[in-house]
């Protein structure tokens, strides 16, 4: 749990679970783009199972670490994460689920830009946690999730207020400029889009 808290704070975890609980009443499945070790994935699956709702959790990750940064990721606050950093194997995530006894989610191994929205994503999405750390990953995640987001669906983007990772904020701000019907609320480093 210690490594997880370095990535997502206690307060952010509580907010994520609070919003995911609200999304249980919304049509569609839960998705997480950028699952890393599966910490939030385990929490989301447990929430779904405890709710007795017929929802699935879908996880997406390259399981090859981060892609190369782009100019949109340049930060004057210092450098955080390099290409291939945050590497965790798909097998490790699967094993973590098996150890907990939770149902294994749908797990797709690929870089986000290689996903096919028609075949790789659920038909409807109630809740999306986007944790790709970089501009291109968040921009692509938003473009994949938005057409499938249910009315009252919720998207959370991690690292919005992280000065060492400005890419997510740039991607979210561009998205909101093109999609003014969405609202943005901020909580620590989470961008809450609904």
Task: List the predicted regions and their residue ranges.
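A short alpha-helical cap/connector motif
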Residues: 1-194
